[in-house]
């Protein structure tokens, strides 16, 4: 044991403390028992096999350790603050996303109900010659009512699932926010203690040094990571309207608007990058989707649907271009003039983006065929995963100006030649009565 003789002599270790047993200066420190020793204590059997060093050396060693933990604590505090801010931002973001997906589901339901009603009317018109057969007419009406009811039930279920996933996500984020907030408070308190410890004199610093060190380390071992939440885009809207078959358009590519890097097939349905025409300048990590071409067909009214095979492309875009096209290879490239779905692969990871605004979507597996639906009157554009028969994303209440033209684009690679290609698919006869020349 050690004892203080005079408060005025606390900073002079040779006069600061004396051994109560031997009344000699305590100039040594036992790291095992965490006490100061005099020379006679050091020679005793009790400390014979313990790690003992000079008291100044011990203090400096602990001071360095405390300083290292202090630096680590400051770094960990910044990381915890960042996670806390991110979780708070994500809480606001998922609320907005939930509302957006709710509007998207409601918009898709309204569109499908309109198409269903139109299909019902067409079926009744085709049975006009059998109008006297009331049983047949009643059967058609009952069938339409049943389909409309099933459609409403499906979309109500989707809204309920969306709400359930949204609540689960919010609970996870709130729990994560609470953990991050608690860690920020703990680290702030620890940093204050460590700063005080590093500034203390030799004896004060060594007091309970090992305990303070271990407690500090245990706080730093607490791992913090952001909450894992369910992507709302997983709430797929299943099924494709049977009316899409009627609205299917047989599109062709317009050579006059094709980028010089593109080679078009003879039937003007397939586009691929020319060999040896890639622009190698610039950042090799940059994605340049300027290898663009418009469809020869344009739309000013009505509803239209087409499908694109993207299986042989690793970086592609499909969508709608609204505006005028200039000379060959110089179609307007302002992003604000296009509504796009973008697909890209990095290694084994596939990513989908929609624009505008730029938003990333969750993709469970590679997309092979994209369906595009356009309703000019209602300002709606929908993208579909044809293979999975599900909605990818839709835009509603778009303010279109002028003629609308389907747009297709491939990414110009920097370096090696890309084998990427896109093909416009055709299924059966087309109904192009509402297609403008």
Swiss-Prot record:
GO biological process: innate immune response; protein ubiquitination; response to retinoic acid
Enzyme class: transferase
Entries under SMART domains matching the protein: PRY, SPRY
Reactions catalysed: S-ubiquitinyl-[E2 ubiquitin-conjugating enzyme]-L-cysteine + [acceptor protein]-L-lysine = [E2 ubiquitin-conjugating enzyme]-L-cysteine + N(6)-ubiquitinyl-[acceptor protein]-L-lysine
Source organism per UniProt: Homo sapiens (Human)
UniProt-listed Enzyme Commission number(s): 2.3.2.27
Name of the protein: Probable E3 ubiquitin-protein ligase TRIML2
Chain's gene name: TRIML2
Binding of Zn(2+), residues: 19, 22, 41, 47
Coiled-coil zones: 55-200
B30.2/SPRY domain sequence ranges: 231-429
Source domain of life: Eukaryota
Pathway: Protein modification; protein ubiquitination
InterPro entries xrefs: B30.2/SPRY (IPR001870), B30.2/SPRY_sf (IPR043136), Butyrophylin_SPRY (IPR003879), ConA-like_dom_sf (IPR013320), PRY (IPR006574), SPRY_dom (IPR003877), TRIM/RBCC (IPR050143), Znf_B-box (IPR000315)
